[in-house]
Regions:
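A Lys-centered signature of the CheY-like receiver
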Residues: 47
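Adenylate-forming
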Residues: 8-16, 21-30, 40-44, 56-64, ...
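Alpha-helical sensor/transducer elements of the RecA-like P-loop NTPase core
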Residues: 3-7
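Thiotemplate assembly-line natural product biosynthesis machinery
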Residues: 92-97
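Receiver (REC) domain switch/active-site region of two-component response regulators
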Residues: 50
């Protein structure tokens, strides 16, 4: 594996945007019947769905199948996007987001271990965890009983955690959407992903059930108006730029699609190569997945801000919150307990004043 990691490290490098193609591919034999296929694409021409499409088409071609002709090309989508900006529906979406983020925008202030770099650092690591099966079952039940989704339940719990740690009751969380709103877009390779900046305002005198209803409605509205580019929103809001932070939010929440990534053919099988995680696109990103009823998660965190012990503690507190709301969703947010007495390395020594 160390040899494979060395190949990958030498393979992945910056692209010159002035020179096509923004794609490189390499196949290396690492054993008698083992190969490493590497492909590197600039994010402006691809997204996660694109990667899956490439693998699926590669499998079809390997088996001698003909690829289905595409109904449209990415350039058609780009033209449609430009035309869409002139329509009234686009103006309605713009109005929604400007209203949603009106007023003074909150800046998330989590306790950190080290001084924030003057310029954003993308050095990071990942910490993975699994939620107890009984708690997972309870969370699924809450989602079903409240007419919400597991995504909404987990996102709401995450905002409670952030509010407990930051002492803030006004938060903006980023969440990605695939952006492929038409079936014709599904098989295309290109950059369709948009990120939604969703505002959350948990209050200590609310029950989790009540807060979840608010979060559900807010999330549904955001997804209804998802087809409005984040970069356009940042420009319209005229956010004061700070080189040490993202313009609108410093944390993301993602619920991952857990389709099997291993493919087996008659004479070949392949699966993703798992490499040690060393980047963090934001201060903190919580990614969750639901695999056959079992909820798993991971924190991607900036190592210039947080120590590993701090993230382990954050994880324990998240699981504690999930356990408490799983047992009693009518618990007041202010009564939800976290392990605030523990002070591991990795957070600043200042006490954490909880808002609840």
């Amino acid at each position: 594996e160390s040899e494979a990691d060395a190949y990958i490290e030498s393979f992945v490098r910056s692209f010159d945007l002035r020179q096509a193609p923004l794609l490189r591919v390499r196949l290396i034999q690492t054993g008698p019947e083992r190969h490493l296929l590497m492909y590197d694409m600039h994010h402006i021409i691809s997204d996660g769905v694109s990667s899956n499409n490439i693998v699926q088409e590669l499998v079809q071609l390997y088996e001698g199948q003909a690829l289905e002709p595409l109904q449209i090309q990415y350039k058609d989508y780009a033209v449609w996007q430009q035309q869409e900006m002139q329509r009234e529906s686009y103006q309605r979406r713009e109005h929604f987001w400007l209203e949603h983020l009106a007023g003074e925008l909150p800046v998330l202030n989590l306790p950190i271990a080290y001084p924030r770099p003057a310029v954003r650092s993308f050095e990071g690591a990942m910490y993975e965890f699994t939620v107890d099966a009984n708690v997972s079952e309870q969370l699924h039940r809450i989602a079903a009983q409240t007419g919400s989704t597991l995504y909404m339940v987990l996102l709401s719990a995450y905002t409670v955690l952030l509010s407990k740690y930051s002492g803030q009751d006004d938060l903006i969380i980023g969440t990605p959407v695939a952006g492929r709103l038409l079936p014709e877009l599904e098989p295309l390779i290109g950059m369709f992903v948009n990120t939604l900046a969703i505002r959350h305002q948990p209050k200590g005198n609310q029950t989790f059930h009540s807060y979840l209803q608010e979060a559900r409605d807010r999330t549904l509205q955001a997804f209804e108006h998802q087809d409005y580019p984040l970069e356009e929103l940042v420009e319209k809001l005229d956010v004061a730029r700070d080189a040490s932070r993202n313009p609108l939010f410093d944390t993301m929440f993602v619920l991952q699609n857990t389709e099997s990534q291993e493919t087996k053919l008659e004479t070949l099988s392949f699966s993703p190569y798992v490499q040690e995680h060393s980047i963090s696109k934001f201060d903190l990103t919580l990614s969750m997945s639901d695999e056959d009823g079992e909820i798993k998660g991971s924190f991607e965190y900036c190592t210039k801000l947080f120590g590993a012990d701090a993230i382990e503690r954050l994880t324990r507190d998240l699981i504690a919150i999930l356990s408490q709301i799983g047992i009693d969703p009518d618990l007041l947010l202010g009564d939800i307990q976290v392990n605030s007495d523990e002070r591991p390395e990795g957070f600043s020594p200042d006490s954490i004043d909880f808002v609840f």
